[in-house]
Swiss-Prot record:
Biological role stated in the UniProt entry: A GTPase-activating protein (GAP) that modifies Der/EngA GTPase function. May play a role in ribosome biogenesis.
Chain spans, region Disordered: 1-98, 144-169
GO MF annotations in UniProt: GTPase activator activity
Sorted UniProt keywords: GTPase activation, Ribosome biogenesis
Acidic residues composition bias: residue spans: 147-159
Assembly mode: Interacts with Der.
Biased composition (Basic residues): 10-19, 31-40
Gene: yihI
Name of the protein described by the UniProt record: Der GTPase-activating protein YihI
Species of origin: Escherichia coli O6:K15:H31 (strain 536 / UPEC)
Amino acid sequence: MKPSSSNSRSKGHAKARRKTREELDQEARDRKRLKKRRGHAPGSRAAGGNTTSGSKGQNAPKDPRIGSKTPIPLGVAEKVTKQHKPKSEKPMLSPQAELELLETDERLDALLERLEAGETLSAEEQSWVDAKLDRIDELMQKLGLSYDDDEEEEEDEKQEDMMRLLRGN
């Protein structure tokens, strides 16, 4: 015997219900109405459109049809070159005053302390410290001062003491 086909259909996929002509017509009208709504609303230019832009302290609405009020040059205008102001030169300090400023520089002291503690400085900091120390050396040479003077005096005294001991004074 053959199994009945009605039982297999109810358990399996149900056949899609066909839409009536009225339903198809209604869907077509809805699609057509949606297509008609494209574009801008009529009269948007006269109605104002953007109320937020261009209202910098003015209560009257600005007409978007009116253009810019900036003047436009009609003839050939010569370019005006701006003269650069010379930078004010730093007042020249005496070598003694500059040396005192460098010796009391807090940043230099802090970086030198970090170096003595064994820290490594960045390349920029290291170059800055080197430049300042070089400047201090230049100023000390100009002024006739030197860190080596104290060491040389101590060495001279030691030499003299050694000579005295050898001579038997």
